[in-house]
């Protein structure tokens, strides 16, 4: 936390609402807090695509109905599903004490790429979070 931030500023209703949304709304959180490496090696905010938003809505619907999410995703390559799942897991474990996540792939190289993505989320995320 920056030393020039006062307690009054931290308790400002607008700031508190933003923090609440960052904690509770992944669609709000992702483009503001998660940085990804694009196909052309640029670092940019995670702007969810159509497939990612669809997967998110299906997961949230199941969570609303059952209280949890269990999905098996049979996916084509390069749709962003692994990025979405990595971001969702990162959001969950960093905002809810005691939660863990684990992603395993069929290849060590791919598992390492997903770990690097999560590491990037952590290193490049806003300090305030």
Q: Which positions does each model-derived feature cover?
A:
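Phosphate/NTP-binding elements of NTP-utilizing enzymes
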Residues: 2-129
């Amino acid at each position: 936390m920056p030393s020039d931030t006062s307690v009054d500023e931290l308790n400002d209703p607008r700031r508190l609402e933003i923090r609440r949304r960052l904690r509770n709304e992944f669609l709000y959180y992702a483009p503001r807090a998660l940085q990804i490496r694009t196909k052309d090696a640029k670092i940019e905010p995670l702007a969810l695509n159509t497939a990612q938003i669809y997967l998110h809505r299906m997961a949230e619907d199941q969570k609303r109905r059952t209280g949890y999410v269990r999905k098996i995703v049979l996916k084509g390559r390069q749709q962003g599903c692994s990025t979405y799942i990595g971001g969702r897991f990162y959001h969950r474990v960093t905002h809810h004490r005691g939660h863990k996540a684990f992603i395993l792939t069929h290849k060590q190289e791919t598992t390492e790429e997903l770990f690097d993505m999560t590491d990037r989320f952590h290193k490049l995320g806003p300090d305030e979070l």
